[in-house]
Swiss-Prot record:
Name of this chain's protein: Pyrrolidone-carboxylate peptidase
Localisation per UniProt entry: Cytoplasm
Active site: E80, C143, H167
Primary location class: cytoplasm
Subunit comment: Homotetramer.
UniProt GO BP: proteolysis
Signal peptide stretch: none
Reactions this protein catalyses: Release of an N-terminal pyroglutamyl group from a polypeptide, the second amino acid generally not being Pro
InterPro entries per the UniProt record, alphabetical: Peptidase_C15, Peptidase_C15-like, Peptidase_C15-like_sf, PGP-I_bact-type, PGPEP1_Cys_AS, PGPEP1_Glu_AS
Annotated organism of origin: Yersinia pseudotuberculosis serotype O:1b (strain IP 31758)
SUPFAM superfamilies in UniProt: Pyrrolidone carboxyl peptidase (pyroglutamate aminopeptidase)
Transcription keyword on record: no
EC assignment: 3.4.19.3
Family: Belongs to the peptidase C15 family.
Length: 215
């Protein structure tokens, strides 16, 4: 049976919950068109997150890996285009580490592009009435760290496996502690992630449509 690995993070930065795990854990053991979804939680910690991710990939042997993370302040489901080879942490991770201008992989390439049909995914999610867009930066915190490490692994050892990263907004119960911050319901995020998986499994060549910002 084919499997999809989807990951979410533990809470960080003083939050009580992390929306990525709150939604992703609901997808564990879900069957979609003969494909089994396996959900795993990652620690919000440099190095440790990649160790946990690589262990999960070894255990699950997925055909697709989707890493999901919180992007408080964003209003859309944002599908990341690129990961860069640098850790530059504005705040410490959950183990107290705060790397500044450190490469994720020594002698690794400057960046990796996603292995997902991101524009087709955005289009499909929007057609379901859920805000979505292509993002040009995954930041330089643990989310980018995981995306870069994932794509490095897939490019080096699992070239047939698709993979990438999706950022999601705060849940409403988080946004009440951040006046003015946008949020999205867990149900809408769940629908968006199910669509993302379905489209990623079906589409081999991405749509040739615009998705970039002006600035």
């Amino acid at each position: 049976m084919r499997r999809v690995l989807i990951t979410g993070f533990e809470p960080f930065g003083g939050e009580r919950i992390n929306p990525s795990w709150e939604v992703v854990k609901q997808m564990n053991d879900l069957m979609m068109g003969g494909v089994r979804i396996v959900a795993r939680q990652l620690p919000c910690a440099f190095g440790e997150a990649l160790t946990a991710l690589n262990t999960a990939i070894d255990d699950v042997q997925p055909v697709l890996v989707l890493a999901i993370g919180q992007a408080g302040g964003r209003a859309d489901i944002t599908i990341e285009r690129v990961a860069i080879n640098v850790d530059d942490a504005r705040i410490p991770d959950n183990l107290g580490n705060q790397p500044v201008d450190q490469p994720i992989i020594q002698e690794g390439p400057a960046a990796y592009f996603t292995r997902l049909p991101i524009k087709a995914m955005v289009q499909g999610i929007r057609e379901a009435g859920i805000p979505a867009s292509v993002s040009q930066t995954a930041g330089t915190y643990v989310c980018n760290h995981v995306m870069y490490g994932l794509l490095h692994r897939l490019n080096q050892f699992n070239n047939e496996v698709k993979g990438g990263f999706i950022h999601i907004p705060y849940l409403p119960e988080q946004a009440v502690d951040h006046p003015g911050a946008p949020s999205m319901s867990a149900q809408s995020v769940l629908v968006a992630l199910e669509l993302a998986i379905s489209i990623a499994l079906q589409i081999e060549h991405d749509l040739h449509i615009t998705g970039g910002p002006v600035h």
